Each structure stands twice: as C-alpha cells, then as structure tokens.
Swiss-Prot record:
Component of the nexin-dynein regulatory complex (N-DRC), a key regulator of ciliary/flagellar motility which maintains the alignment and integrity of the distal axoneme and regulates microtubule sliding in motile axonemes. Binds calmodulin when cellular Ca(2+) levels are low and thereby contributes to the regulation of calcium and calmodulin-dependent protein kinase IV (CAMK4) activity; contributes to the regulation of CAMK4 signaling cascades. Required for normal axoneme assembly in sperm flagella, normal sperm tail formation and for male fertility. Keywords: Calmodulin-binding, Cell projection, Cilium, Cytoplasm, Cytoskeleton, Differentiation, Flagellum, Spermatogenesis. GO terms for biological process: cilium organization; sperm axoneme assembly; spermatid development. GO terms for cellular component: cytoplasm; manchette; motile cilium; sperm flagellum. Component of the nexin-dynein regulatory complex (N-DRC). Interacts (via IQ domain) with CALM when calcium levels are low. Does not interact with CALM in the presence of Ca(2+). Interacts with the HSP70 proteins HSPA1L and HSPA8. May form a complex with CAMK4 and HSP70. The gene is IQCG. The IQ domain mediates interaction with calmodulin when cellular Ca(2+) levels are low. This is Dynein regulatory complex protein 9. It is found in: Cytoplasm; Cell projection, Cilium, Flagellum; Cell projection, Cilium; Cytoplasm, Cytoskeleton. Residues 19-31 have a biased composition (Polar residues). Disulfide bonds: none annotated. Residues 1-41, 102-121, 410-437 are annotated as: Disordered. InterPro entries: IQ_motif_EF-hand-BS (IPR000048), IQCG (IPR042618). It comes from Bos taurus (Bovine). Residues 388-417 form the IQ domain.
C-alpha cells in the first residue's frame, strides 16, 4: 500500500490513512511501555475540519489501492480456518463487497467524462473466491497451514478471533472510506475511525497499566499477609506458653488456698470460742452501762426542757431585734436611694457641662487650625514674594550687565589707550591669519 500511495502522488492530508494499518496490527506479546511508545510515535493529530475534496485522479488512485486492500482482506478471510470463522461476519462482508461492487460501477460521475473514470474501476473485479473453494482446495489449504504443531500452538482461538475482528474492522473502515471517496472525494470516515481506534488503544493501555499496578499491590499485600501470619503464629505460640505458665501458677495457688482454708477454719473456730467468752463479759459490762445511760438520759431530758425554755425566750428577743433592724434597713435604703438619685442628676448635669466644654474646645481647635493654615499661607506667600523679588533683581542686574557689555543704547564703556593698542594688534593678527589661509 505504501508503494501505491507514493505512486499516486497524493497530497500530505491523505497520508494518515496508512498510519491506521500500521498501528492496528501490533503483536499481543509486546509490553505496555513499548505499546505506549509506539502509539505515541504513530499517532498523527488529525482534526475533523472540513476537508477539500481530492482531485479525480487522486480519487481513482486511492480507490484502486483501497479496492486492492479489500480484496486482500477478503482473501485472508477465506484463508482463515473454518472452525474459527464467524459465519455471520462472512455473510455481512460478502453483502458489503457486492454492494461496493455495484456502487463502484454506478457512482462514477465525479468528472465530466464518465468513460475515463469508470474504466479503471471496471477492470477491478472481485476475486473469484467460489472457484477456490471448488474441488476441496480450501480444506487442503487449511490442512497445509495448520499441519505443523507449532502453528497450532501459536494460532490459538483467542489470536484467531482477534485477527478476525481486526480484519473485519479494517475491511469496514476501508469500505466506508472507499464509498466516501467515490461519493464526496474526502476521507473523514477514515479520520474518525483513526480517532476512535486511538482512544480505544489508549483506554486499553490504561487498563493494562492499572492491571499491572493491581498485581503489584496484590503481591505486596500477599507479602504483608505472610508477615502478619508469621507474627500472629509467633504471638499465638507466646500466648500458649503464657497460658501454660498461668495454669501452673493456678495449680500452685489452688494448693496454697486449700492449706490456707484449713488453717483459717481452725483459726476461726478458736476465735469464735474466744469471742463468745469476750461477749459474755462485754454483755455484763453493757448492762451496767445501760443502767448508767438511763440515768444520764433522764438528767439530760430535764436539762433539755430548761434549755428549750431559755431558747424560746431568747428567740422572742431576737425577733423583736429583727423587726427593729428591718425597719432601720428600709429607712437607710430609702435614704441611700435618694442620695443615689441626687448623684445621678448631678452626674447628668456634669456630663452635659462636659459635652458643652468639649464642643467649645473643638471649636477653639478648629479656629487654631484655621489660623495656623492662614499663617502658613501668608508665610509661603511672603517667601514666594521674596523669591520673585530676588529673581527680578538678578534679572535686572543681568540685563544691565548685558546692556553695558554689548553697548546697547547710550551705554558705552570707557576705552583706555592700552586697550585700543591691544585691539589693533589683534586685528593685525587676524589679517595675517586670513592671508595665510
């Protein structure tokens, strides 16, 4: 196809069609990085802008190359093994080829003389594929192709399916491009197919990269899981040893507690007998104490009655004092409230007076600021006047000097004799110089 395109003298816009053929046929064994590099090198940016239709000669050349390609793809389809072919895709391909053959003979009126255009398209006929199948030749070809065991190992089912899908896709794209070239003289369908295929390949590469990252993560997680399992096993072993140690301690504690229980039982029996003796003695003592307490309570009741009478009298006195102090509190609070009201009124009057004073102070400050501004203006004006006067005096002095030096008007400087001699000498020197020149 490259030789056909170079021989057809196509413009540069038509060259991306060859890129699709080279990109779609990558082997499946290449790594992801190599695929990405080849895809980046092979991708040529094609914008779906409005393309100018090609010339009739270019259309005919490209159509011839594309028809040759479709014929080769259809032959490849028939060479494929029967058990891996898709019958439906073959029938659809045959229908498209028949339709293309009919349209190629009809849609020739792209130029003024249809006889010259239709002549190169008519002799390009579909290869006679049914004749190849006659006499069992197709089965013989298959037997020859797949006779060796190496071919059987390489051409597995998945590879054949992928080849068949790629072949069908390429055939469809070329067919649509051929129809568009014959109808409109452009190949936008080819550019669109290029863009879609490029996007699908980039998505495929991204999927492969994500899968590799996932595998790496799974490997790292498996390593972590093994490490965790080892740690857990070591921890379980340590805990089992600790449990055995605790069981030994438990047996020792049980034996120790049994001995302590026997000792405590005997000890408690002795203590009970001793406490019973003590209790009998203490009971006698408590009875004596109860009698004493009874006498004491009678005396306390009598004292309590006397204290209660005394407290009632004191309570009455305190209530009278409380009434007195409550009345005094009311009077004092009323007096203090009056004083507070008087202080508030005085505060309000003082506040009003302070506000008036603040207002007066602000007015005085404004007057002072205005006076300072006025003084500053007069000072600047005085300085300006002085500056102007000095400038005028300097200007007058300069003018007087200029008038005197240049003898303007009636002003002339007195000339001495020596000066006249010098002037004459200078005149003679000037005349000598002029003569030399």
């Amino acid at each position: 196809m490259e030789e056909g395109l170079e021989a057809s003298n196509l413009p540069p816009e038509a060259w991306p069609s060859e890129v699709t053929v080279s990109v779609t046929g990558e082997p499946p064994n290449t790594s992801v990085e190599e695929k990405e590099e080849t895809a980046k090198e092979a991708v040529i940016e094609t914008s779906p802008e409005i393309m100018k239709p090609l010339s009739i000669l270019d259309v005919l050349r490209i159509s011839a190359v594309l028809e040759d390609t479709t014929d080769q793809l259809s032959i490849l389809n028939y060479i494929m093994p029967v058990q891996y072919e898709k019958r439906q895709s073959i029938s659809m391909k045959d229908n498209k080829e028949m339709h293309l053959e009919g349209r190629s003979s009809e849609k020739v009126p792209l130029a003024s003389n249809p006889s010259k255009i239709s002549s190169p398209l008519v002799h390009k006929e579909e290869p006679k594929l049914p004749e190849i199948r006659q006499g069992g030749q197709f089965n013989k070809v298959q037997d020859l192709i797949f006779k060796k065991p190496t071919r059987q190992t390489i051409m597995n089912t998945e590879t054949l399916k992928k080849i068949q899908i790629d072949r069908q896709f390429l055939s469809d794209v070329i067919t649509e491009t051929l129809e568009e070239l014959q109808e409109e003289g452009t190949f936008t369908n080819l550019l669109k197919a290029l863009g879609k295929e490029r996007e699908s390949k980039m998505h495929f590469y991204d999927t492969i990269a994500r899968e590799e990252n996932g595998r790496k993560k799974i490997k790292s997680l498996q390593k972590q899981l093994l490490n965790v399992k080892k740690e857990r096993q070591a921890e379980v072993q340590n805990r089992n040893e600790y449990i055995a140690h605790l069981k030994d301690q438990l047996q020792e504690m049980k034996a120790k507690t049994n001995m302590e229980n026997r000792y405590m039982k005997r000890n408690t029996e002795l203590q009970i007998s001793q406490t019973q003796k003590k209790c009998s003695k203490t009971e006698e003592l408590l009875l004596e104490e109860i009698e004493k307490l009874r006498l004491k309570t009678e005396e306390e009741n009598r004292i309590h009655a006397e204290i209660e009478l005394f407290l009632r009298k004191e309570q009455q006195k305190l209530e009278e004092k409380l009434e007195f102090w409550m009345e005094k509190f009311d009077k004092d609070t009323e007096m203090k409230q009056n004083e507070l009201n008087a202080l508030k009124s005085a505060k309000a009057s003082d506040l009003a007076h302070l506000q008036e004073l603040a207002k007066t102070i602000r007015e005085y400050e404004q007057v002072i600021i205005e006076d300072r501004i006025e003084k500053e203006k007069t000072r600047k004006k005085r300085e300006q006047d002085d500056l102007e006067m000095r400038s005028i005096i300097k200007l007058q002095a300069w003018w007087r000097g200029t008038v005197v030096r240049r003898e303007i008007g009636g002003f002339k400087m007195p000339k001495d004799k020596d000066d006249s001699k010098d002037v004459k000498g200078k005149g003679k020197e000037k005349d000598k110089r002029r003569g030399k020149k």
